[in-house]
């Protein structure tokens, strides 16, 4: 059956700031306390969405979350009106304010793990929300992510959206950022590659940075998504690269159809994994980048592998990269050699995503890949699909509500909270989502 990959990109939120919240993510740590520009960040993301949609790649948008997230501050013991809660936390424990104001939901590669209908036992598209258990600021995302996905994939005959796994370290799940799918045409059954960093009883672990994904979580997600057991491979990420800042697999590998583009040090027992994939995926091609050409350190600083690998109708592929790749002489030299070599990659598209990159999120972090048949595409909430009208409406919306300068101190401004809620109220109507945000269901909280 014919099917297409639709990229659902996260729209950057109004409180995008640099707080260094993500230990193990070196860009996040390095840019802590830098002044951010939320308006520019949102526009950079929108430009990528529109350019890819114009190039013929189906594209949609996932909206930001409510931030600062007052309900969690109340759970932490801060009381009073919403304004009083903000004032108290800013004075007594400002680190909590930064955590509950993070715009991290924009990296929707961590929103969920997807199983296309061609791979599932019941013939539905399955989406399991990620619990993002390893980081407090990200663990807050799951309930609203679930509401948003249910508002977008709202036809229960075709889509099953599953709640996140229990919030315990044993079941740490980071979503599609640790998941690849390999195969022929999108509509054919594919091989799902789940990548984990640790498992109970296995002492092969990173020592410097945490392994966020567990094998136990990956296995549970595969079960929830009803993936045919014959179409699943579980593989461990190389713990040495986690210790070099590869906090998700999509920082060191990306797949599309029959191609796996990865660093030669991406996986534990890599040669064994690639042999397994060759045996099980027709026409499988591994493009392994040698450390002699691109070091792990350079891969992390440029986000070479946090790229999007997209298929044209003729079978050729486009590699979507951040500007940092073009600015690094060694990486750009390698990429031009890649273009000249015998493989399906025939074009490089480069985007300026610096606002997101400074927090450790490149092109692949910003998108959730969902393979859909024509009938399934028609069943998706049409208001989220990118086109000229939506692009212009979202640009105007960003101009109206987003600040062009934000520091950690600004997060305590009650006006920022009000601006954010008004903006999301308007956006949820624009995207025909209904009342997906807690403040909409609670009448604006206790302000």
UniProtKB/Swiss-Prot annotation:
Q: Write down the chemical reaction(s) this protein catalyses.
A: N(2)-succinyl-L-arginine + 2 H2O + 2 H(+) = N(2)-succinyl-L-ornithine + 2 NH4(+) + CO2
* GO MF annotation list: N-succinylarginine dihydrolase activity
Q: In which pathway does it act?
A: Amino-acid degradation; L-arginine degradation via AST pathway; L-glutamate and succinate from L-arginine: step 2/5
Give the range the annotation lists for the signal sequence.
none
- The catalytic activity of this protein is classed by the Enzyme Commission as 3.5.3.23
Which residues carry out catalysis? Answer: 174, 248, 365 (nucleophile)
InterPro entries, alphabetized = AstB_sf, SuccinylArg_d-Hdrlase_AstB
Question: Which residues of this UniProt protein bind substrate?
Answer: 19-28, 110, 137-138, 212, 250, 359
Write out the entry's keywords from A to Z: Arginine metabolism, Hydrolase
Into which EC class is this enzyme placed?
Answer: hydrolase
Q: Does the keyword Hydrolase apply?
A: yes
Q: Which GO terms of type biological process are on file?
A: arginine catabolic process to glutamate; arginine catabolic process to succinate
- Quaternary structure (record): Homodimer.
Q: Which family does it belong to?
A: Belongs to the succinylarginine dihydrolase family.
Its biological purpose is as follows: Catalyzes the hydrolysis of N(2)-succinylarginine into N(2)-succinylornithine, ammonia and CO(2).
* This protein's name: N-succinylarginine dihydrolase
Species whose genome carries this gene: Escherichia coli (strain ATCC 8739 / DSM 1576 / NBRC 3972 / NCIMB 8545 / WDCM 00012 / Crooks)
């Amino acid at each position: 059956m014919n099917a297409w990959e639709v990229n659902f990109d996260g729209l950057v939120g109004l409180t995008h700031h640099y707080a260094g919240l993500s230990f193990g993510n070196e860009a996040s740590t390095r840019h802590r306390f830098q002044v951010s520009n939320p308006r520019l960040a949102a526009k950079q993301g929108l430009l990528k969405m529109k350019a890819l949609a114009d190039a013929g790649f189906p594209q949609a948008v996932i909206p930001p979350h409510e931030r600062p997230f007052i309900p969690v501050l109340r759970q932490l013991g801060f009381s009073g009106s919403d304004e009083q809660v903000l004032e108290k936390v800013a004075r007594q424990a400002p680190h909590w304010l930064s955590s509950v104001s993070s715009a991290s939901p924009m990296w929707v590669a961590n929103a969920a793990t997807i199983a296309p209908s061609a791979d599932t036992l019941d013939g539905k598209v399955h989406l399991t929300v990620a619990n993002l258990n390893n980081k407090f600021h990200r663990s807050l995302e799951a309930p609203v992510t679930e509401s948003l996905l249910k508002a977008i994939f709202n036809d229960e005959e075709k889509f099953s959206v599953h709640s996140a796994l229990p919030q315990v370290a044993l079941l740490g799940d980071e979503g599609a950022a640790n998941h690849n799918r390999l195969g022929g045409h999108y509509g054919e059954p594919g091989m799902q590659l789940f990548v984990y960093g640790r498992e109970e009883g296995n002492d092969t672990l990173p020592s410097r940075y945490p392994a966020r994904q567990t094998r136990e979580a990956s296995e549970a997600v595969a079960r929830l998504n009803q993936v045919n057991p014959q179409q699943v491979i579980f593989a461990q990420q190389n713990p040495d690269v986690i210790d070099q800042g590869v906090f998700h697999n999509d920082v060191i590998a990306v797949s599309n159809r029959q191609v796996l583009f990865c660093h030669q040090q991406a996986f534990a027992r890599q040669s064994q994994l690639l042999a397994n994939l060759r045996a099980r995926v027709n026409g499988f091609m591994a493009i392994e980048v040698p450390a002699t050409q691109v070091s792990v350190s350079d891969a992390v600083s440029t986000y070479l592998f946090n790229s999007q690998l997209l298929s044209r109708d003729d079978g050729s592929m486009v590699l979507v990269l951040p500007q940092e790749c073009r600015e690094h002489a060694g990486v750009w030299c390698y990429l031009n050699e890649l273009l000249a070599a015998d493989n399906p990659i025939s074009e490089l598209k480069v985007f300026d995503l610096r606002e997101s990159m400074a927090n450790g999120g490149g092109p692949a972090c910003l998108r959730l890949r969902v393979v859909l048949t024509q009938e399934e595409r028609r069943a998706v909430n049409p208001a989220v699909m990118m086109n000229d009208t939506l692009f212009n409406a979202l640009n105007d919306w960003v101009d109206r509500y987003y600040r062009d300068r934000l520091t950690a101190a600004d997060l305590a401004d009650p006006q920022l909270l009000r601006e954010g809620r008004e903006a999301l109220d308007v956006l949820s109507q624009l995207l025909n989502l209904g009342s997906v945000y807690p403040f909409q269901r609670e009448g604006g909280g206790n302000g």
